[in-house]
């Protein structure tokens, strides 16, 4: 008799029972309890929200400051909404080329987006972001993932390194060299500035503009002979989905990873959870031609109904495009489903063996007890929910805890082309 898998926290009990059968009386029903948080060890960790009441002795200047702050916040919200609508209109003009004719260079669209986001981010303060708790949660996930698979003295290659947001995390792991490659030249420039401004980073950083997935890495790294290949670690955070535009790009991405790693090296990262995407699509009626879901801070939209028309299966493991919008971060950029079994199969073909795959919420619950006292007080505060537990809540929970999964592979043999 087959063993039923544990119910994902984002799946309703009704859907689980329909797919796997009703839970028996003798089974442990605690599996259905939501596990995205863990209670802090003392009541002192509880963060109380700002007091909403105003006492009679608050000065007029404080009231004026609050009003100015509220006015500014309202204007910022309106500005972001205008930018989002403009981006949606621009994207609609490209959808036919992106989906049917496939002649638009998605790399250019992604590059332009992240160049633009870099300039916008330089003008805004991170702690004013409407998704600050989501950012904190994602950072915690990366801290724990990097620490788990990175060792002292390692040479690290990060594909899609962005603005170098993980440099300090790798510094804490004690690496000796960091090679970062990203398609956005503006992001690489910002990563250079970040590295130069950071103190006590005892490792060499080589930051390169290049295409990690569309061509051989040799094209990008050839002018940098100081890069110490093969590496101990290859990491890709929130970007591998771009490689699944075509089978050719996905294979090139995995070949780049394999050729860059020494035997025994680790390849790890974060990607959208294909099972969660399938779950959400299954919840939408089959007559909906452009399936879409989300909330006030994020949305995902498929431009066709191929999934339902193909019997609730993607017609191909490659090229299954959707557009993703995340408030203050992603502006309706094309992304691609990464069927995890396809990723695992490709990795195996290129000499890498799966050692970990786990949704964010489960990974967080598993690892956070080891990290409660290792995180800084500021980090712990940023992870504390309104109920005194560590995690993420409200409208930020779905795009943070449920949408993504962590993975890790180990290179066990050389790939022979």
UniProtKB/Swiss-Prot annotation:
PROSITE patterns: RNA_CAP0_MT (PS51562). It comes from the Eukaryota. InterPro entries: mRNA_G-N7_MeTrfase_dom, mRNA_G-N7_MeTrfase_euk, RG7MT1, SAM-dependent_MTases_sf. Keywords: Methyltransferase, mRNA capping, mRNA processing, Nucleus, RNA-binding, S-adenosyl-L-methionine, Transferase. Its EC number is 2.1.1.56. Pfam families: mRNA_G-N7_MeTrfase. Residues 129-412 form the mRNA cap 0 methyltransferase domain. It catalyses: a 5'-end (5'-triphosphoguanosine)-ribonucleoside in mRNA + S-adenosyl-L-methionine = a 5'-end (N(7)-methyl 5'-triphosphoguanosine)-ribonucleoside in mRNA + S-adenosyl-L-homocysteine. MRNA binds at residues 138-139. Gene3D superfamilies: Vaccinia Virus protein VP39. It is found in: Nucleus. S-adenosyl-L-methionine binds at residues 142, 160, 182, 211, 237, 242. GO terms for molecular function: mRNA 5'-cap (guanine-N7-)-methyltransferase activity; RNA binding. Belongs to the class I-like SAM-binding methyltransferase superfamily. mRNA cap 0 methyltransferase family. This is mRNA cap guanine-N(7) methyltransferase. It comes from Candida glabrata (strain ATCC 2001 / BCRC 20586 / JCM 3761 / NBRC 0622 / NRRL Y-65 / CBS 138).
């Amino acid at each position: 008799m087959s063993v039923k898998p544990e119910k994902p926290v984002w799946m309703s009990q009704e859907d689980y029972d329909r797919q796997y059968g009703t839970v028996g009386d003798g089974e442990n029903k605690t599996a259905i309890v939501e596990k995205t948080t863990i209670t802090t060890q003392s009541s002192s960790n509880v963060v109380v929200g700002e007091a909403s009441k105003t006492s009679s002795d608050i000065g007029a200047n404080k009231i004026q400051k609050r009003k100015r702050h509220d006015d500014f916040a309202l204007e910022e919200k309106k500005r972001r909404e205008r930018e989002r609508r403009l981006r949606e209109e621009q994207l609609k003009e490209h959808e036919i080329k992106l989906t049917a004719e496939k002649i638009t260079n998605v790399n250019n669209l992604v590059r332009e987006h992240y160049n633009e986001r870099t300039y916008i981010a330089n003008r805004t303060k991170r702690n004013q972001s409407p998704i600050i708790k989501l950012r904190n949660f994602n950072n915690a996930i990366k801290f724990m993932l990097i620490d788990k698979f990175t060792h002292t003295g390692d040479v690290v290659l990060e594909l899609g390194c962005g603005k170098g947001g993980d440099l300090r995390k790798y510094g804490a792991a004690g690496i000796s060299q960091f090679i970062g490659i990203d398609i956005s030249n503006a992001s690489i420039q910002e990563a250079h500035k970040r590295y130069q401004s950071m103190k006590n980073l005892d490792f060499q950083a080589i930051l390169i503009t290049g295409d990690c997935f569309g061509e051989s890495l040799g094209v990008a790294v050839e002018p940098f002979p100081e890069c110490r290949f093969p590496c101990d670690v290859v990491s890709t955070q929130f970007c591998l989905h771009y490689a699944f535009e075509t089978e050719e790009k996905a294979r090139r991405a995995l070949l780049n990873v394999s050729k860059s790693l020494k035997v025994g090296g680790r390849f790890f990262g974060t990607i959208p959870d294909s099972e969660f995407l399938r779950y959400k699509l299954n919840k939408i009626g089959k007559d909906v031609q452009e399936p879409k879901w989300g909330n006030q801070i994020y949305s995902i939209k498929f431009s066709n109904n191929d999934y339902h028309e193909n019997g609730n299966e993607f017609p191909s493991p490659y090229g299954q495009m959707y557009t993703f919008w995340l408030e203050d971060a992603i502006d309706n950029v094309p992304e691609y489903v990464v069927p995890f079994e396809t990723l695992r199969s490709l990795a195996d073909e290129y000499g890498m063996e799966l050692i970990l795959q786990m949704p964010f919420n489960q990974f967080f619950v598993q690892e956070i007890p080891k990290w409660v006292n290792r995180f800084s007080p500021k980090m712990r505060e940023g992870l504390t929910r309104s109920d005194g537990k560590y995690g993420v809540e409200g409208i930020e929970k779905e795009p943070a805890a449920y949408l993504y999964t962590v993975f890790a592979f180990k290179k066990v043999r050389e790939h022979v082309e």
